[in-house]
From Swiss-Prot:
Zinc finger extent (C3H1-type): 294-322
InterPro entries listed in its UniProt record: CAF1_poly(A)_ribonucleases, RNase_CAF1, RNaseH-like_sf, RNaseH_sf, Znf_CCCH
PROSITE patterns per the UniProt record, alphabetical: ZF_C3H1
Modified-residue entries (N-acetylalanine), positions: A2
Oligomer status and interactors: Interacts with U1, U2, U4, U5 and U6 snRNAs.
Disordered: annotated span: 1-23, 332-400, 491-510
Entry protein name: Target of EGR1 protein 1
Membership in a protein family: Belongs to the CAF1 family.
Localization terms from the record: Nucleus, Nucleolus; Nucleus speckle
Gene: TOE1
Molecular-function annotations in GO: poly(A)-specific ribonuclease activity; snRNA binding; zinc ion binding
Record Pfam families: CAF1, zf-CCCH
Amino acid sequence: MAADSDDGAVPAPAASDGGVSKSTTSGEELVVQVPVVDVQSNNFREMWPSLLLAIKTANFVAVDTELSGLGDRKSLLNQCSEERYKAVCHAARTRSILSLGLACFKRQPDKGEHSYLAQVFNLTLLCMEEYVIEPKSVQFLIQHGFNFNQQYAQGIPYHKGNDKGDESQSQSVRTLFLELIRARRPLVLHNGLIDLVFLYQNFYAHLPESLGTFTADLCEMFPAGIYDTKYAAEFHARFVASYLEYAFRKCERENGKQRAAGSPHLTLEFCNYPSSMRDHIDYRCCLPPATHRPHPTSICDNFSAYGWCPLGPQCPQSHDIDLIIDTDEAAAEDKRRRRRRREKRKMALLNLPGTQTSGEAKDGPPKKQVCGDSLKAEETEQEVAEDETRNLPHSKQGNKNDLEMGIKAARPEIADTATSEVPGSQASPNPVPGDGLHRAGFDAFMTGYVMAYVEVSQGPQPCSSGPWLPECHNKVYLSGKAVPLTVAKSQFSRSSKAHNQKMKLAWGSS
């Protein structure tokens, strides 16, 4: 899949039927490899035209970051959105972005209603100013294959805050971010508040002091809209869990079911890169779910709920995402069966002689319900409530909600899945999707895939001049809160001075 061509020709698309799963004629599943282009200082100029072309021709761009830390975790979960914003701002001013992932998705209407060409890039960065790097972040990134020696030797240099002179014509990460703004494409992130704040401070300008000014700036920077796949997975797709790897794998599986049923489904193509680029391509495997999955150990409850476990690869319980989803789906089906049985019993009681479905006789006053009927109704309502609670934003987690916000630097989103690599651990020896290296590029791809699948699952969209996927438009997930952050410019907020200067740089003095 997406193998290198030997003639050095222009990269050609390589198809992946059904998303990131492809079947042979014999029905055997193939492991599909997602090519992630590594971009560093030694090939940044060479890759510059490809980066610009991918961004400018994309229908939407997904972004992910790896950070050097975040600071005080409690402040990042402050129930006051303004105080939470200030805490993230402090982190962005004192920490840095270590790597940037870009996944550009371009529609191919001639190849199907939901066909995309996906181009994925992983940029290794090096902030040229002093910044804090946290030990936990280092441990996590090293555990997932991040090469700090390579980062310091080959990281693309950049500076934070406001521009230093005219940088609009230089080939830099800051100019690349400006080109992303100029492209006016929808921006897709996962649990995106932290990413947005860090992107602004590191590649754009000094952050404004107030959240209202920040969202006003964002509204003008990305007029096509900002989309958060964590919000989409939790509030619209209603997944049991919404951390990135869970959402991605769940969408993969559902997309495979739709493909098998002949229903509308997502298909992807990747570029067939020439052999001259071989040293700069990292192929990430996406495995089909096993038909008969062994159950060697119990599932880690912490990882199942949050996508993160404090024991990491030393955990004796399973972190297998497919096994977690299998268990969730089995539990949901069991609840549906029990609910149907209770509904049948309820109807049988209502149809007994002397009872009325409306609780009211034809020629007399209302009669009391049969005692058993009342109990059955209460049980049914309770079960429905349990189902709804399970699909709400992890109410049982309390103030711990996700830990994602507080540990995004050592991302819990897909943390510590490589359990089979630790000698002596009792985890499943079978590899799972996303195993091994933890890359901002592949995370960006997973983020974009989830958004593309959400579009498929919502069915045909009415032709209008309105925004793409209006239910998710400009809504950014806030951990621990029941409502998202709305990216909008209110009548009480003004854009920041630094932002206005950047807009003049992007669009000219007008």
